[in-house]
Every structure is written in structure tokens, then in C-alpha cells.
């Protein structure tokens, strides 16, 4: 049996894969948080609930409408994004000129309301969501079997993350979004509808959370608690990467997922706290985060 640092290669590669899977969800969710905070200056505590909404929307589309996984992967983010747009336009937009604490408290209350509603109707136990037939099975890599769906999760999340990064950082629309945050009056003078841009930004963040939820549905059971169990870790990832940093959210999400996975191999007792230990160290040495800009 091949060993690496005294660990069987199958066990090492298996945990590396688990780390990449978790990192894919960390990256997608952190990216949504970074987009919302970086462009709206809102700490969106409802992000975990929107992730859960994505998974439940996919499940309900399947059970009530017979909508398959591939269509749900498109429809669920659009539905949750529309829900986010309504929330932003009708309620959240009224808090922009107030202290950040008000936005945090509002989104925290919204998360509790959404989670409580789903717990009332569906209970706290998880419900299965089957992966599509085309993504079932595994590929023999020689040293391990790679579940096809797990590989799809990593690839899909990477494509979406890079696509959003390109949209925000390299396109004219992204330039308008960034400028609208810094100087909305100037952007409006060019005939740009700034309130609409802000609404679309929040919808994008909510849609990213929902997309992650649909990807997660076949990996984990669909549960009202799935978002609240993950959101604290995701906030830690965002802090390490730098609040509002798009690239930082993506890179740090994957990196910390891998670190967490490898920690389960070499020091399992620390696997549940390693991300928070890294966050504490980063806050001490570089408070703005690894990719954040110093104030």
C-alpha cells in the first residue's frame, strides 16, 4: 500500500476530495457574501437561509412539478434571486444610509424567519435529493474512485466563481456596479439606474447561494438547518479572504476547504476548529484579510 507521510494514499486523496467539495461550497457562498458586502456594504446573515432555499426550491420543483435537476439548477437560483430582489427593494434598501448593524440585524431576523417557516412545515430532519443519472457512478483513477457527481460539483462551482469574478472585475457592467458603490451620484449622471444595479447585485448574491444549495442537495440531505450549520464557517472564510474581496472569497474558499480536509487526516481533533484558528491568526497579522485592502 502506497503511503504519503505515513498516511495511505487512498485516505489522503479521499480527504483531499472532501476538502475540495467543501471548498467548492465555501467559495460559492463566500463569493455571494463578498459581492453583497463589497458592493452594498451589507453583512448578509440571510445567506445561509438563501442557500437552504435553493436546495428546497430544487426539491419542491422535483416533487411538485417534476422538474429535473438540470432545469432546477437554472430555475432555483432565478427564483431565489427574484425573492432576494423583492426583499432588497422593499425592505433592505431602506437601511443603506444607516449603520451596518441595522442591515446585519435585519438579515439575521430574515434568516430566522425563513428557517423557522421551513422547520414548521418540514421539520428538522433531512430529505434526500437524488443526483441525475448522468452524474451517478464513479471513475477509477487508479489510486481511488472519484464519484462523478463530486467532480461535477468542483467543476461547476469553479466555472461559476470565475464567471462572476470576470463579470465584476473585467466588464463594463462590473465597473458600473463598483462605481455605484463609491459614487452613486456620479454614476446616475451617466443615466445609469443605480437602485436597479443595487437590486441586481443583491439578487446575484442570493442566486449564488441558491446555486450552491442545488449543488449541495444530492451531496447532503435537504434540511431547514443546512444553511445555519454552514454560514458561520463561510463568514470565517470571508474574513480570512478579506471582506468584499471577490478573488479573496474564491481562493480562500477552496484553500480553506482543502486545509480542513487534510486536517481530518493528520490531526482529526482539530478539523472542526482549524478554519477559525486561521481566521484568528489572519485577524491578528492582517486585519483586512489576505486579499483585502487596508483602510
Task: Describe each model-derived feature in a short phrase.
Residues 66-110, 117, 251-256, 286-287:
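Alpha-helical transmembrane segments within multi-pass membrane transporters and channels
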Residues 1-28, 57, 69-72, 98-102, ...:
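Membrane-interfacial amphipathic/re-entrant helices at transmembrane-helix boundaries
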Residues 94-170, 197-200, 221, 262, ...:
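Transmembrane helix-bundle core of multi-pass membrane transporters
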Residues 22, 144-222, 246-252:
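Helix-loop-helix "hairpin" substructures at the membrane interface of multi-pass membrane proteins
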Residues 26, 66-78, 199-214, 218-279, ...:
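Transmembrane alpha-helical segments in multi-pass inner-membrane proteins
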Residues 2, 11, 90, 121, ...:
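Cytosolic-side transmembrane-helix boundaries in multi-pass membrane proteins
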Residues 11-64, 90-102, 238-246:
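Single transmembrane alpha-helix segments in multi-pass membrane proteins
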Residues 55-59, 77-83, 110-118, 156-165, ...:
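Hydrophobic core segments of alpha-helical transmembrane domains in multi-pass membrane transport
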Amino acid at each position: 500500500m502506497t503511503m504519503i507521510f505515513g498516511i495511505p494514499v487512498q485516505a489522503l486523496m479521499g480527504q483531499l476530495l472532501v476538502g475540495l467539495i467543501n471548498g467548492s461550497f465555501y467559495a460559492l457562498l463566500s463569493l455571494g457574501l463578498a459581492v453583497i458586502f463589497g458592493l452594498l456594504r451589507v453583512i448578509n446573515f440571510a445567506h445561509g437561509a438563501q442557500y437552504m432555499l435553493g436546495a428546497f426550491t430544487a426539491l419542491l420543483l422535483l416533487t411538485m412539478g417534476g422538474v429535473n435537476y438540470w432545469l432546477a439548477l437554472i430555475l432555483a437560483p432565478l427564483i431565489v434571486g427574484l425573492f432576494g430582489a423583492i426583499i432588497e427593494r422593499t425592505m433592505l434598501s431602506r437601511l443603506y444610509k444607516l449603520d451596518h448593524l441595522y442591515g446585519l440585524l435585519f438579515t439575521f431576523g430574515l434568516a430566522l424567519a425563513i428557517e423557522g417557516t421551513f422547520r414548521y412545515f418540514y421539520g428538522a430532519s433531512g430529505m434526500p435529493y437524488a443526483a441525475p443519472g448522468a452524474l451517478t457512478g464513479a471513475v477509477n483513477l487508479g489510486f481511488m474512485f472519484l464519484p462523478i457527481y463530486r467532480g461535477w460539483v468542483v467543476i461547476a462551482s469553479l466555472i461559476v466563481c470565475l464567471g462572476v469574478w470576470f463579470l465584476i472585475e473585467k466588464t463594463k457592467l462590473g465597473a458600473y456596479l463598483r462605481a455605484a458603490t463609491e459614487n452613486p451620484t456620479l454614476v446616475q449622471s451617466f443615466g445609469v439606474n443605480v437602485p436597479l444595479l443595487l437590486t441586481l447585485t443583491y439578487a446575484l448574491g442570493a442566486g449564488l447561494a441558491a446555486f450552491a444549495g442545488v449543488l449541495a442537495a444530492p451531496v447532503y440531505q435537504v434540511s431547514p438547518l443546512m444553511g445555519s450549520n454552514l454560514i458561520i464557517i463561510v463568514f470565517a472564510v470571508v474574513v480570512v479572504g478579506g471582506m468584499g474581496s471577490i478573488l479573496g472569497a474564491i481562493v480562500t474558499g477552496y484553500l480553506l476547504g482543502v486545509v480542513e480536509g487534510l486536517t481530518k487526516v493528520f490531526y482529526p481533533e482539530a478539523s472542526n476548529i482549524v478554519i477559525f484558528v486561521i481566521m484568528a491568526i489572519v485577524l491578528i497579522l492582517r486585519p483586512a484579510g489576505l486579499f483585502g485592502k487596508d483602510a
